[in-house]
Structure formats: structure tokens, C-alpha cells
Amino acid sequence: MALYGVRKFVFNTLLNTGKAKIQEEEIDFETLADTYVQIACYINDYNKEASPEDFITERSISTIIASITLHISNVCYCTPCAAGKSTVAIDTNGELYACDCLVGEKEFTMGTLKGEYKIPSIHAFPKLAERKNETIQHCKTCIWRSLCIYKCAADTYFLYGDLYHPHSYCRFSQIILPRFMELLDSHRIEACLFPMC
């Protein structure tokens, strides 16, 4: 991809809405974790030979590594949810929404580009602002809660109709975090080779 000028990409998993909400098959998180490890090793090896301006990166992997090594994450992986505060999405018709994953959900509309709209703030969507690891029963006792990047409120909103369930990738997080820690500890991958997207 770098040969074509693409340096940042996303290995996007499914958001549980539409047809993806019908879970006829279980996701094989072990195989998914193997794939993430392979991608991380590829990125590491590529970037090791490249100059920093030519580095490639994948959003979820770089965020997991930053979470482990720096204890930081970007807007889509933070708690409380930053939707409507630090991020806004614009639909094709000019409607504003708290998040690109919530476009079309009237509960999360902020108005329109041509009309009145809510000013982005933590108070714009109290339910999203109140959703944090400490308010989700399963998450508040999880040993991975401070490193887990799977905190997207839209995932649980579409899957359960509320904001107070663990993310559908909770099990994946429990698998991938120790694997990436092992890769970092053994120096198979180096955190400095994974810039944030």
C-alpha cells in the first residue's frame, strides 16, 4: 500500500448493526488475534527499514500499542465516550451526529449544518458522557479495563439497545493484549515503529 502513497489504514471489524447484527456464526477471536499479530509484525518489519515519514500504520494496532506503552488512546477508544464532545459526524444530507457510527440515529443528532445545532460538549449527550468502564458492571472488575481499546458506545447501543454492556470485542481484548505485551517484551515489535493514526 505504501507504494501507492497509502500509509495509514484500518483493519476494520464489523459494527453490530444491519446484517452484521445477526450473529449466525461466532467470531473466532483466536484467529483474529493471530491475524492482528501477523499485521503488527509486518508493520514493524516494514517500518524498521523505512524512514519515519514513510512509516505505515494500522489504527487499532497502533492504538493497542499506545495503550500498553503510553497509556493513551485516540478519541474512538476513550472512556468516557467522546462522541458529541470531541468528535462530530456529518451525514450526506447535512445532519450532524455525535459520532460517525451513530449517523442516522435520531437520539444522537446534533442538528444540521444549515440550521440550529448543539455545541459539542460533554453535556451534549449525558448518556454517552456517563458511559465509562466504571459504569459497566463487567468492565469495572476486568483486569484489562485500563488498557482495553474496545470501548465504543455504538457497538453496545446497536447490539443491546443500551450503553451499559461490555463491547462485543471484550473477549478479543483479553486475548490480544497479552499477545501484544509478549511481542513488545520480547522485542519482536517496537512501540516507536507504530505511529498513531
Task: Locate the predicted segments by residue.
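Amphipathic, alpha-helical segments enriched in basic
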Residues: 56, 65, 69-74, 85, ...
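Generic marker of residues within folded, mature protein domains
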Residues: 78-80, 84, 132, 160
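Flexible mid-to-C-terminal extensions adjoining Fe-S/redox cofactors in radical SAM and related proteins
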Residues: 103-197
